[in-house]
Regions:
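Generic detector of short, locally flexible boundary/turn motifs and exposed helical patches
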Residues: 22, 30-31, 64-71, 120-124, ...
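Short, low-complexity N-terminal intrinsically disordered segments enriched in polar/charged residues
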Residues: 18-38
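Short solvent-exposed beta->alpha transition segments
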Residues: 30, 46-100, 113
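Generic surface-pattern signal
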Residues: 38-42, 70-78, 133, 188, ...
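Generic anion/oxyanion-binding catalytic loop in active/binding sites
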Residues: 9, 37, 54
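Bacterial Sec-dependent N-terminal signal peptides
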Residues: 1-24
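Exposed beta-sheet edge and beta->alpha loop/turn motif
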Residues: 93-192
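Short acidic-aromatic low-complexity motifs
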Residues: 34-49
C-alpha cells in the first residue's frame, strides 16, 4: 500500500511539473519569436540559424542558408517584420521524441526594394498578394516599400519531448512540400 501511495505522489508531482512548464510556454514563444524576428530584421544570420529546427539543415547546409539570406539582400530586398501579437498556440502534438506547437501570430511586414528587385516590383506585389491577400498589401512609392500592416503568420515550435529547448520554423503554404521531408504528415495534419 505504501508503494502505491508513493507512486501516486510521484505521478502527481510529475503532472504538476508538466502543467507548470505549459503555463510558461506562451511567454517563452512570444519572447523567442520576437528575438527571431529581430535577428532577421538586423541580418544576424547566426542567431536566426541557431534558433531554427536542426532537421531543416538536412535539406541544405547552414552556409547555403546564410548565402541565400545575403543574396536576397544584395539583390535589393530588405524584409522587416514586427511582432504585433501572438494569437493562438495549438495544443501540443507529441511524437516519440519530439513535441510540436503551431503558433499563429500577427505582424507588420515591410518589404523595401531597391536595385534589381525594384525593377520587379509588380511581380513582388503579386507574390505578396497571393500570400497575404489583395487588400492587405499596400505600396509606399516614395520609400519603394510594400507594407502588410496586420499579416497573419505562423511558426512551428519544436522541442525534444519533455524539454523547453524550442527551435522554430516559419510555416506557410508555399513550403508544405519541403516540411513534409522533415516533419511527418500526421504531425502537420494535427497542427492545422
Amino acid at each position: 500500500m505504501k508503494v502505491l501511495i508513493n507512486v501516486f505522489l510521484l505521478l502527481s508531482l510529475l503532472s504538476m511539473k508538466v502543467v507548470a512548464q505549459d503555463t510558461g510556454t506562451p511567454s517563452v514563444f512570444k519572447t523567442d519569436i520576437a528575438t527571431y524576428l529581430t535577428a532577421m530584421n538586423q541580418e544576424q544570420w547566426d542567431t536566426v540559424i541557431d534558433m531554427m529546427y536542426p532537421k531543416f539543415f538536412t535539406l541544405g547546409s547552414k552556409e547555403q542558408l546564410r548565402q541565400s539570406f545575403a543574396q536576397v539582400t544584395e539583390m535589393g530586398m530588405k524584409v522587416t517584420t514586427q511582432l504585433n501579437a501572438v494569437e493562438k498556440i495549438s495544443p501540443v502534438v507529441l511524437t516519440s521524441n519530439e513535441q510540436f506547437h503551431k503558433i499563429d501570430y500577427r505582424a507588420t511586414v515591410k518589404v523595401k526594394m531597391s536595385g534589381i528587385m525594384l525593377e520587379n516590383k509588380e511581380q513582388m506585389k503579386k507574390q505578396l498578394q497571393s500570400i497575404y491577400g489583395d487588400k492587405q498589401v499596400k505600396y509606399n512609392a516614395p520609400k519603394h516599400e510594400f507594407i502588410i500592416a496586420n499579416a497573419k503568420k505562423s511558426m512551428l515550435a519544436i522541442a525534444p519531448t519533455y524539454s523547453n529547448l524550442w527551435k522554430y520554423l516559419d510555416l506557410n503554404a508555399q513550403q508544405e512540400q519541403v516540411l513534409l521531408r522533415i516533419i511527418s504528415k500526421e504531425v502537420l495534419l494535427q497542427l492545422h
